Amino acid sequence: MDLTVDPNLHSLINSTTHRWIFVGGKGGVGKTTSSCSIAIQMALSQPSKQFLLISTDPAHNLSDAFGEKFGKDARKVTGMDNLSCMEIDPSAALNDMNDMAVSRANENGNGGDGLSDILQGGALADLTGSIPGIDEALSFMEVMKHIKNQENGEGDRYDTVIFDTAPTGHTLRFLQLPNTLSKLLEKFGEITGKLGPMLNSLAGAGNVDISGKLNELKENVEKIRQQFTDPDLTTFVCVCISEFLSLYETERLIQELISYDMDVNSIIVNQLLFAEYDAEHNCKRCQARWKMQKKYLDQIDELYEDFHVVKMPLCAGEIRGLNNLKKFSAFLNKEYDPVADGKVIYELEEKN
């Protein structure tokens, strides 16, 4: 029986069940290029479906990668009818929350007690903006919003959402949120069970059912936790380069993901030289680096023999703009052949 795993992402690109795809790894290894490439290939392979690519990295790069401006609202990629992008902007989201709090304060008759004046100055946004993990929390809220929209038939509907995540530490905090919130809400539930009437009276004229709101939030968080741990719905694609530190961090990331019960079976290895196949450009430095890369590639192949390990070439130019991304991303669907495809890495269009 042949247990060989294909060295490409063909099965994921053509998947009809996945709703959430996370792309992550160490900083500077090509996560954004990889997430854009996965999103493009899925959109090209399944033209009847809609895909959304979300950047949860504070150093948003989607706009730079595609060469067009994206913001906090999803917008179609020029030249692709079924792929949209958005960049979650924590500062803009916090300002929106601040404005909402001002409106609520005025509605509840608190406009004259100074609270509205404080909030008008952006105090809530300033305070919450300094809380560690706020970026991850806002990204999580975006996931909750999309699930709610899908269930209620509201807003734009997307068959699959691809996440261009922040470097490893931020991503792990984001993925911990469902479990953390679930435990936190359980504790809150115990408190509200004992102090419910008093808490509801403190809610004021708004007559907010705090216990009901907490239960609703807990149900939504549990739905996300269940979806994130369902391998048919969610998977994580690790991105690395063939160097010691990147390999070490990838292993740590994979072990953490396994502890969260998340599916992870794909690794993209970027920036490979394939020096012995390129006699025309094979300098001593290239030979030395390729020798080092092969050493760690051998370790990757040994450690992750049951993973889809996709080996991507180092291109001569920048992989920016839709046309260049299409050329590069094709090697996710059908693995790069350094002999047959060697010329492609020198044929990228220059971008200003």
From Swiss-Prot:
It comes from the Eukaryota. It is an enzyme of class 3 (hydrolase). ATP binds at residues 26-33, 243, 270. Its main location: cytoplasm. One of its GO terms (biological process) is tail-anchored membrane protein insertion into ER membrane. The keyword Endoplasmic reticulum applies. One of its GO terms (cellular component) is Golgi apparatus. It is found in: Cytoplasm; Endoplasmic reticulum; Golgi apparatus. Keywords: ATP-binding, Cytoplasm, Endoplasmic reticulum, Golgi apparatus, Hydrolase, Metal-binding, Nucleotide-binding, Transport, Zinc. Its EC number is 3.6.-.-. The active site is at residue 57. Pfam families: ArsA_ATPase (PF02374). ATPase required for the post-translational delivery of tail-anchored (TA) proteins to the endoplasmic reticulum. Recognizes and selectively binds the transmembrane domain of TA proteins in the cytosol. This complex then targets to the endoplasmic reticulum by membrane-bound receptors GET1 and GET2, where the tail-anchored protein is released for insertion. This process is regulated by ATP binding and hydrolysis. ATP binding drives the homodimer towards the closed dimer state, facilitating recognition of newly synthesized TA membrane proteins. ATP hydrolysis is required for insertion. HAMAP family: Asna1_Get3 (MF_03112). Belongs to the arsA ATPase family. Homodimer. Component of the Golgi to ER traffic (GET) complex, which is composed of GET1, GET2 and GET3. Within the complex, GET1 and GET2 form a heterotetramer which is stabilized by phosphatidylinositol binding and which binds to the GET3 homodimer. Interacts with the chloride channel protein GEF1. This is ATPase GET3.
